[in-house]
Amino acid sequence: MHDYLYLASQSPRRRELLTQLGVRYELLLADDEEDAEALEVVQPGETPDDYVQRVCALKAEAALRRRERRALPDAPILTSDTTVCLGGEILGKPGDGADASAMLKALSGSTHRVLTAVTVVSTLGMHHALSISRVTFRAMTAAEIERYVDSGEPLGKAGAYGIQGRAAEFVERIEGSYSGIMGLPLFETAALLRQARLRF
């Protein structure tokens, strides 16, 4: 049994969600010379489902190498990746305010999918889970989109919004996992952690 895990994620939401589960963790973040962004390039013809699972697994492999390179004690490693897709189009993190505005305009008045993949690596192997949720946004005015983008909240978030923040006012309905939409589906994550023999 393990008493803690390594979290290979910079996301404050994922930290909050792990704490909510009562999981002890240490951060295992990328070194300066690692090109984390290169992992997130969409491959030609790749579906959103395949994309998010591939990126999550690559993050786990990179974190495992990082743990070994730093000669850290053995403990499970958790990685996660979230993507938003509308139709078959992957909406990643916006590059700037104009990019965020375009994404939010596309999401306005429609239903999109939020896919969050989770990978846990332990001595028992590499185990994966995928959470798929549907989110319906009410129609948003151009002024509302502009105000939200000006808040700075959309930057750094897949699909240009965080459901736990100001964007909650645009969410008409969700089907699936609220924590998954935030970035770490707790039901699936807890099952993976039990598989990895983590005490929490």
From Swiss-Prot:
The organism's superkingdom is given as: Bacteria
EC number(s) on file: 3.6.1.9
Any one GO cellular component localisation term in the record: cytoplasm
Q: Which UniProt keywords apply?
A: Cytoplasm, Hydrolase, Nucleotide metabolism
Q: Name one Pfam family in it.
A: Maf
Give the Gene Ontology MF terms in alphabetical order.
dTTP diphosphatase activity; UTP diphosphatase activity
Q: What is the reaction catalyzed?
A: dTTP + H2O = dTMP + diphosphate + H(+); UTP + H2O = UMP + diphosphate + H(+)
Site-annotated residues for Important for substrate specificity: R13, T82, Q164
Tell me the cofactors it needs: a divalent metal cation
GO biological-process terms attached to the record? nucleotide metabolic process
Q: Where is the active site?
A: D81
Q: Record's InterPro entries?
A: ITPase-like_fam (IPR029001), Maf-like (IPR003697)
Subcellular location(s): the record lists:
Cytoplasm
Q: Which family does it belong to?
A: Belongs to the Maf family. YhdE subfamily.
| NCBIfam families, per database record | maf
Q: What does this protein do?
A: Nucleoside triphosphate pyrophosphatase that hydrolyzes dTTP and UTP. May have a dual role in cell division arrest and in preventing the incorporation of modified nucleotides into cellular nucleic acids.
Q: HAMAP family recorded for this chain?
A: Maf
Write down what this protein is called: dTTP/UTP pyrophosphatase
- Species in which this protein is naturally found: Cupriavidus pinatubonensis (strain JMP 134 / LMG 1197)
